[in-house]
Amino acid sequence: MRLTSLQRVGHTAVENNLSNASQRTILLKDENRLEQRLKEIPAEPGCYLMRDVEDRLLYVGKSKCLRNRVRSYFRSSSDHGPRIRLMVRQIAEIEFIVTDSEAESLVLESNLIKNQQPHFNVLLKDDKKYPYLCITWSEEYPRIFITRRRRFRNKNDRFYGPYVDVGLLRRTLLLVKRSFPLRQRPRPLHQDRTCLNYSIGRCPGVCQQKITPQDYHQVLRKVAMVFQGRNQELKVLLEKQMERYSDRMDYESAANIRDQIKGLEQLTEGQKMSLPDSSVSRDVLAIASDHRVAAVQLFQMRAGKLVNRLGFTADAVDQTLGSVLQRVIEEHYSQVDAVEVPPEVLVQYSLPQQELLVDWLSEHRGRRVQISCPQRQAKAELIELVERNAVFELSRAKSGQQQQELATEDLAQLLELTTQPRRIEGYDISHIQGSDAVASQVVFIDGLPAKQHYRKYKIKSSSIKSGHSDDFMAMAEIMRRRFRRWARVKQEGSNFENLQRCSGSALQTDGLNDWPDVVMIDGGKGQLSSAMEALRELDLHEDLVVCSLAKKHEQIFVPGQSKPLDSDPDQLGVVLLRRLRDEAHRFAVSYHRQQRGVRMNRSRLTDIPGLGPRRVRDLLAHFQSIDAIQLASVQQISQAPGLGPALALQVWTYFHPEADIALEEVA
């Protein structure tokens, strides 16, 4: 890439001297700014980024000619769908990154979309029903586990998936752990000895370093081949290794390898679907869509057998099926190793930039990759098979969506709302006798958790402290902090009603997009009264729909009524509120435990002579937990920021008072 830093189009000296965000906002609202930008865009390959007046990223795109591509959005003759037309009306700023080639821009675009999540791009949904398998290569002794969250704590960690059949994934991992000795626990069970897993051959004893990191990585690389679909290649590798051990008369090691081969054969026995040609390796992608959501299935065929079935869900509004397929291909193959890219990829529809993808995949693999859209014979039958699976996954997703719509409709009837609530928020308080008091705000959108909108609060009231709790006061404080911004908008008369209606939609561009249709308080009449009193102070008590859900008999209370609403605990609207209440409780309790653990850890470390608040904070940041500090050696502790050998010895001695070690031995 020729220009590695972000280039703002027409970046002036005035912009270089901007001292605060308000000045930049003034420039973004300049009517002539965008017209000037369009004149200065270079006719070179690269990526372009479009922002609104609030400097929020709307869209990321790529092109072999930035000037022609960006200008096409603003031509009256361009045939854009309603989604793109809506985006164009919001564009206030255009930025670009110039690259050496169009292939480079494709990789850059994929990374920008993944990291920034622009609103108008075709985004793969964070669908937690499809699990991943993670290998933490960033650790000295990596772990392997199943997760539904694809979060890279370290760029070296590796995710495989998302897998459609979680049962098959669990059985595969169980068989792998029986065949290959792997780290079984996230933390050691004992400080000074191995556990039972080592004794029965399930673990190589990583907690006591019975195996070197290099040898353990060799074992794990073989395991990774299973989830890369390279079973046949792994079998050949193991057979050669077994022969070498036999030639050296190391029959015990040869027997261990033989058992691993048997375990691998058990895995391949379950791969019933196969192709006539056992040498064929290809990926097959098909899609099913209802014009709102698309379900994409990817079948991985290796050595003639179906080894993996992956599933993706993507936004499909105002998108062609080919563009959705292309986005899935870009997302998936940008995160796999070169050995996982097959020589052939079959797709159901032609891709908008198929030749570019062929070049990019070929470069990534190191050998030629072919992308084709078959119409006849066996390859077309494969596409039809994958499409049937995609249709099934889409219908299953729509069935769950219909259930959520029925729940929100029932809730609207229960609370006498004129429209179905789209955004509902739940609040709960958590503490132990007033200590470490916190609150949670959880959000459901269209009946499903929207975790990107969750919020955590530390209770600031000085009257709520250890030994003195007041849930009512805490709830009132949270209501004030949550809605005071909206109260200011209402007082200023800034078109308050229109902002409420547009909140949460793509039409809203003023930054106020979090007005809830329903607010639910975890508790009874007391908590509800406290919340309403706080909202009355903000003059929002008549604008918000507020209710509370008491644990006893799942009773729903609303303002102005002393008795609970007439409802059935099993009706869909009540079940939705109960899910919201339970999620708010879980989120609040987990945050409270986190805060309590931090406080207890700090108080324990502050007992060590020479450790002040800053060094305690640095030590915890370095090791993440007291247990890790306790298991560390003096040399490892001395590597923490601000700790030399003498202070590291002091810390180590605090946790090992029976040990006898001198500073000279450490040095």
Swiss-Prot record:
Residues 232-267 form the UVR domain. Residues 43-122 form the GIY-YIG domain. Its main location: cytoplasm. It is found in: Cytoplasm. One of its GO terms (cellular component) is cytoplasm. The keyword DNA repair applies. Keywords: Cytoplasm, DNA damage, DNA excision, DNA repair, Excision nuclease, SOS response. One of its GO terms (biological process) is SOS response. GO terms for molecular function: DNA binding; excinuclease ABC activity. Interacts with UvrB in an incision complex. The UvrABC repair system catalyzes the recognition and processing of DNA lesions. UvrC both incises the 5' and 3' sides of the lesion. The N-terminal half is responsible for the 3' incision and the C-terminal half is responsible for the 5' incision. Belongs to the UvrC family. HAMAP family: UvrC (MF_00203). This is UvrABC system protein C. It comes from Prochlorococcus marinus (strain MIT 9313). The gene is uvrC.
